[in-house]
Amino acid sequence: MKITKITTYRLPPRWMFLKIETDEGVVGWGEPVIEGRARTVEAAVHELSDYLIGQDPSRINDLWQVMYRAGFYRGGPILMSAIAGIDQALWDIKGKVLNAPVWQLMGGLVRDKIKAYSWVGGDRPADVIDGIKTLREIGFDTFKLNGCEELGLIDNSRAVDAAVNTVAQIREAFGNQIEFGLDFHGRVSAPMAKVLIKELEPYRPLFIEEPVLAEQAEYYPKLAAQTHIPLAAGERMFSRFDFKRVLEAGGISILQPDLSHAGGITECYKIAGMAEAYDVTLAPHCPLGPIALAACLHIDFVSYNAVLQEQSMGIHYNKGAELLDFVKNKEDFSMAGGFFKPLTKPGLGVEIDEAKVIEFSKNAPDWRNPLWRHEDNSVAEW
């Protein structure tokens, strides 16, 4: 079997799919994207295709190493996202050829279900509370929400009080009937993170995500030393070499590699094993589409330390398409009591509605994240 063609499709709301075709008619799908840089990743995918056309798709490990090492410059969000989507598609092909789900090819299940959590948007406490009530009606009891709006490098007590007030009202409304993580989204400087984490401790959030930017990772152990709240990070780390430094430094309790940013299934399985060796849990980052989610689920079901799975159903970014709009076998992604079950169809287990993908790709938006500014008109972290 040989790879004959690679096609990319930019899609709403902010996704990109790729299709790898073979001379035997077996097709694999992947999801390579950096949100806000889809065209750049698309160019990288097509550059990498020169290494892939005419090659045997079953040699996933060798093709991965070629894509990573054949170029003198390596790593980073663009290259690793391009590799990630290609890697997903290669695993999809292998599973279809062998008539087995990817998790079966990786040694089989370590669990029968995985807890999912849902994003809850809204700037006002009442909006967040209403959103949680709605999601509880369909079985969710675990959530994630923004921990704060933009904060200055040194901000005032009013900004801190506003963030804490939202969390306090949520805990008061639901008590211990729900769990929620707080995403600082890298918006908070190290000095302000110390203040905010201390103030939030009485409300027992499940975790705090990206308490500071990944490039300030030297603060993770310092922040962890002052709190009992687990710290989470990983969506802006792109290879096992990035994660190695964080694991060695300590401080992170929940690792969040993104299967569409950090080299795909091949790389993230290695990252999961590294995390387990440090007694660090795994909760793959996934505010993206169905192929990315499927890849995450296969890792979840073969990784002992996986504890939570993010998913984008109803997320506020999903303008123009919802999580399963391009999927034919929607029922395979159904949840019971807030848990996903293993996908059982061969490969990634996603049946893509290709006609719909082609149609929607004709008018795909160029999504960009908002540009925020502080009161003094300096650029704020989004």
Curated annotation (Swiss-Prot):
It catalyses: D-galactonate = 2-dehydro-3-deoxy-D-galactonate + H2O. Keywords: Lyase, Magnesium, Metal-binding. This is D-galactonate dehydratase. Pfam families: MR_MLE_C, MR_MLE_N. Pathway: Carbohydrate acid metabolism; D-galactonate degradation; D-glyceraldehyde 3-phosphate and pyruvate from D-galactonate: step 1/3. The gene is dgoD. It comes from Escherichia coli (strain UTI89 / UPEC). GO terms for biological process: amino acid catabolic process; D-galactonate catabolic process. The record marks 258 as: Increases basicity of active site His. Binds 1 Mg(2+) ion per subunit. Reaction proceeds via an anti dehydration. Its EC number is 4.2.1.6. The record marks 310 as: Transition state stabilizer. It is an enzyme of class 4 (lyase). SUPFAM superfamilies: Enolase C-terminal domain-like, Enolase N-terminal domain-like. Belongs to the mandelate racemase/muconate lactonizing enzyme family. GalD subfamily.
